[in-house]
């Protein structure tokens, strides 16, 4: 089920990023310890009063070399395009400015719910000036202080009241997948090929955002799929469509609402920095991942080309060593018929549960083969392990001292688990806990 999307909009220097960080708190979706991942804090998962939602910081969307008014106009348009609810942020210090009124006009025409936050109300004496902002036409302005974290509860109460009603859940057994990747790698061609004459299209189901259409279809075996955000992939002609941060933001939403992500690379152009950014998000979100090398028909090949390109991918995406790679051509339909089966396999692995007794046999055999590390005469002791979650499979290992579990030994244990059980296509999370 798609989570509601909340966007923070406003002219520069009103404190959008501060408010973003306050609301996101420690739930910002990018973790700090994955090697090789390019980080960008434009998007976070958050929660208020038990309601989960995705948060967009449009302050992080830079339209390079654009005039000031054009920049804030495009920023507002992006928010309108993506959000279910908009937090319109202004500043008490400057009062109502021409730029504020310009953004207000765009938001007013959008018919999206708008909650007006007046930032930088850092002391009670300033509260009387908040009433000036009624002139913007969005009802009660909410006085807040990003610097001190004041007033955010009332603001978020108003935000969640405007969330759309939930639509029906997917039928049991339905697999949700998305195609992610930078612009022009051929995602739309793959969509059209997958939804061709040999597919039964059940319906186009409107998501919680205005134009995020999720497409249901069944494969030749009768298994059900939902392709997430086909509208976003197919959409053309918008000025900001090919700006990197917009496409990353769209990919993040699709990843968040998927079980499996098909990470599409342009085989003719190779790997770019933006590819690494999008792949990093999917990995850190714990989704099942398939690497799809498209436009393979355009690559000059010999008997070693595929193996060499696969080695190139493994070198560039060390943290995706578990992800299967498939070489396709949307133009010629090469290997596209294999994708539904591969998606089903990865989804099965993503949901795999291992019985504790069997898991511990594997762990103890691994330790017998490669003893645990020691430090200053003290040896790491592993008592037992258990699986605590799926999607992704998550294992807790109970030890005498979690600090002694070196990254390399944790990786060794993970590899032994992978050797014993089929977890291809899914990350594995390992958590060390001290035995009480």
Swiss-Prot record:
PANTHER family: GTPASE DER. The gene is der. NCBIfam families: GTPase_EngA, small_GTP. Residues 352-436 form the KH-like domain. The lineage of its organism: Bacteria, Bacillati, Bacillota, Bacilli, Lactobacillales. Residues 4-167, 175-351 form the EngA-type G domain. Belongs to the TRAFAC class TrmE-Era-EngA-EngB-Septin-like GTPase superfamily. EngA (Der) GTPase family. Pfam families: KH_dom-like, MMR_HSR1. This is GTPase Der.
């Amino acid at each position: 089920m798609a989570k509601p999307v909340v966007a923070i909009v406003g002219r520069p220097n009103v404190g959008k990023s501060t408010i973003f960080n306050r609301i996101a708190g420690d739930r910002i979706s990018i973790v700090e310890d994955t090697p090789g991942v390019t980080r960008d804090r434009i998007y976070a998962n958050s929660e208020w009063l038990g309601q989960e939602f995705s948060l967009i910081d449009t302050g992080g969307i830079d339209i390079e070399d654009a005039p000031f008014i054009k920049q804030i106009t495009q920023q507002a348009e992006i928010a309108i395009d993506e959000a279910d609810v908009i937090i319109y942020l202004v500043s008490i210090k400057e009062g109502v400015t021409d730029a504020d009124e310009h953004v207000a006009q765009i938001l007013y025409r959008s018919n999206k719910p708008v909650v007006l936050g007046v930032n930088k109300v850092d002391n009670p004496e300033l509260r009387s000036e908040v009433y000036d902002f009624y002139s913007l036409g969005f009802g009660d302005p909410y006085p807040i202080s990003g610097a001190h974290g004041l007033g955010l509860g009332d603001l978020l109460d108003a935000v969640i009241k405007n969330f759309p009603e939930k639509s029906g859940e997917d039928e049991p057994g339905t697999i949700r997948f998305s195609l992610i990747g930078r612009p022009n790698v051929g995602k739309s061609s793959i969509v059209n090929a997958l939804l061709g004459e040999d597919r039964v299209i059940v319906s186009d189901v409107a998501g919680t955002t205005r134009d995020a259409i999720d497409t249901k279809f069944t494969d030749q075996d009768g298994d059900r799929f939902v392709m997430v955000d086909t509208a976003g992939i197919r959409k053309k002609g918008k000025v900001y469509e090919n700006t990197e941060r917009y496409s990353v933001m769209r990919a993040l939403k699709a990843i968040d609402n998927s079980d499996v992500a098909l990470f599409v690379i342009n085989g003719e152009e190779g790997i770019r920095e933006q590819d690494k950014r999008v792949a990093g998000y999917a990995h850190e979100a714990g989704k099942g991942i398939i690497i799809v090398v498209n436009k393979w028909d355009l690559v000059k090949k010999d008997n070693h080309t595929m193996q060499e390109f696969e080695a190139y991918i493994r070198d560039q995406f060390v943290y995706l060593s578990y992800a299967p790679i498939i070489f396709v051509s949307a133009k010629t339909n090469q290997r596209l018929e294999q994708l539904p089966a591969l998606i089903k396999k990865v989804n099965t692995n993503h949901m795999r549960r291992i019985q504790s007794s069997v898991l511990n046999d594997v762990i103890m055999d691994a330790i017998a083969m490669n003893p645990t590390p020691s430090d200053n005469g003290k040896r790491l002791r592993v008592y037992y392990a258990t699986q605590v979650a799926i999607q992704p499979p998550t294992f807790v290992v109970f030890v005498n001292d979690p600090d002694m579990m070196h990254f390399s030994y944790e990786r060794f244990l993970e590899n032994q688990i992978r050797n014993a059980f089929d977890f291809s296509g899914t990350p594995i999370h390992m958590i060390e806990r001290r035995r009480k």
